[in-house]
A protein has these predicted regions:
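Metal-dependent nuclease catalytic cores that hydrolyze phosphodiester bonds in DNA/RNA
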Residues: 1-150
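Non-catalytic, well-ordered alpha-helical scaffold segments
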Residues: 72-76, 176-179, 255, 259
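A signal for specific C-terminal beta-sheet/loop modules enriched in small/flexible residues
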Residues: 2-11, 118-119, 167-172, 285-301
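Mg2+/Mn2+-dependent nuclease catalytic core
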Residues: 107-113, 120-238
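Short, charged/polar micro-motifs that form catalytic or ligand-binding hotspots
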Residues: 61, 65, 69, 167-172, ...
Length: 302
């Protein structure tokens, strides 16, 4: 075999551009009431609803972001399959070839038509009277002897962040997300095959060495944190009626929660009001906005 050569300059520059690649995506940023976006920042939502569409920043795309997202999707599929094989994961299972859905039931199922192993279908959290958001649950485990129900959420991250979790505990936003799922089930608002969740578990998995480096974190379900989650949504919606920017969840642009914020450069500007429209963009459907304070009150009384 011949000796290796130094890369041609053209190739070296091309590879470097790919590794560092970053550009505006096709879509402008928006704020959705999804569990994966919790906790909702009231100030970000207010800016989103009053910033003219043409001035809203585009969602940034990057090679590293694409690589992380795609590897995360693949790891989720592998984790769900092997939790089904080894731990009788509870949920719905689908054969895409035959378009057959089975469950909710425990363990990887064979397709009744072609006998091929079926793929785990994440249980959906739907909006309801006390649940003003949507989302998908990564995994449910039911302990056979005690019927204890665990809600699992997989987070694929870098080795450095695994170290941070082991030192300082889970990321706040991740707990808000999985806790919201658990409360949605415990409030009796979801048809997912289980009627309660006893514990939530965040499983941080190293994208580079998923078979070696895990950092599982078990936590209780908190009604108090859920009420805070709903209060943030209610504050965001109410601010649009009052047309006054509310406080956000960050204290400065240096706050860790602000790192990926699409509007952090204008959020703390003393000239913020001059950048916003005097009209809601796009307009709300009025009746829908009035529900959030009532939802919070009903959860408090539940």
């Amino acid at each position: 075999m011949p000796r290796t050569e130094s890369l041609d300059q053209y190739l070296a520059q091309s590879f470097d551009r790919v590794r560092r690649g970053r550009r505006d995506g096709l879509n402008r940023f928006k704020v959705d009431f999804r569990a994966s976006s919790l906790p909702v920042c009231p100030r970000l939502y207010h800016i989103y609803r009053r910033l003219p569409w043409a001035k809203r920043p585009f969602v940034q795309e990057s090679f590293t972001g694409d690589a992380a997202a795609m590897s995360g999707t693949a790891l989720h599929l592998a984790l769900q399959r092997w939790f089904g094989l080894e731990c009788q994961a509870f949920g719905r299972w689908k054969c895409f070839k035959c378009d057959v859905l089975v469950g909710p039931t425990a363990g990887v199922q064979a397709c009744p038509k072609c006998q091929a192993p079926m793929i785990y279908q994440e249980l959906e959290v739907e909006k309801s009277k006390l649940v003003p958001f949507t989302g998908h649950i990564d995994m449910v485990l039911v302990q056979p002897k005690t019927n204890r129900v665990y809600l699992l959420d997989f987070k694929t991250i870098s080795p450095r962040k695994i170290f941070e979790v082991r030192q300082s505990g889970p990321y706040r936003k991740h707990y808000y997300q999985i806790n919201a799922y658990a409360n949605a089930i415990n409030l009796g608002q979801q048809d997912v095959g289980v009627d309660h969740v006893d514990k939530v578990v965040l499983i941080y998995v190293d994208r580079g060495d998923p078979w070696i480096t895990w950092a599982p974190v078990q936590m209780p379900v908190s009604r108090k944190v859920y009420r805070e989650t709903l209060a943030l949504i209610a504050t965001a919606k109410r601010s649009i009626k009052e047309m006054i920017p509310p406080r956000g969840i960050c204290s400065s642009t240096e706050d860790p929660d602000a790192h990926w914020c699409p509007v952090k450069n204008i959020c703390f500007s003393p000239l913020l009001e001059t950048m916003l429209s005097d009209e809601v963009q796009p307009r709300d459907v009025g009746d829908r906005d009035r529900t959030y304070d009532r939802i919070l009150q009903e959860v408090n009384n539940h």
